[in-house]
């Protein structure tokens, strides 16, 4: 084999390696969850050892202080995660996005639950004047409210209350830290006048 041919093979190998790394990075980014190394090997149609080797190279390339992400490998699964030192900024973004993702109905429902908890869906519907099923479902899915028992009346309706996630979401130490409703109403009426 001549020297030019060997150099071309080496270039092709580096190019293929970089392509695999690019694909792995895309898969990890889009997944958001750990991906089994075996599954990556299947997707890439290559051996698990090769994927592990590529992952280790990628992991080392993310080590620099100027990088905001890193590769986490645990129990033969791999995930792209943010570096712990950036967590405060990531949390700010997530709080902003969650607030933006709550509909007006969900925010109204959440306010009622926060101030009147524990409260039933029927009581929420009466206060709002419309059904709140979808808003309650959304808040349950986001773990901002929870079922916290049943009312001891016929039919035993579910009681809803806020979660620890609710407190974190609004930066509160406890449920008692919620602004006083009467004070808010007085302030609101002053602003309207």
Swiss-Prot record:
Q: Which UniProt keywords apply?
A: Cell cycle, Cell division, Chromosome partition, Cytoplasm
Subcellular localization: Cytoplasm
Question: Which regions form coiled coils?
Answer: none
Give the Pfam families listed for this entry: SMC_ScpB (PF04079)
In Gene Ontology terms, what is a biological process of this protein?
DNA replication
Gene Ontology cellular component? cytoplasm
Superkingdom of the organism of origin: Bacteria
What InterPro entries does UniProt report for this protein, alphabetically?
A: ScpB_csome_segregation, WH-like_DNA-bd_sf, WH_DNA-bd_sf
Residue stretches spanning the membrane: none
Matching entries from PANTHER family are given as:
SEGREGATION AND CONDENSATION PROTEIN B
Family per record: Belongs to the ScpB family.
In UniProt terms, what function does this protein have?
Participates in chromosomal partition during cell division. May act via the formation of a condensin-like complex containing Smc and ScpA that pull DNA away from mid-cell into both cell halves.
Q: What is this protein called?
A: Segregation and condensation protein B
Source species of the chain: Clostridium botulinum (strain 657 / Type Ba4)
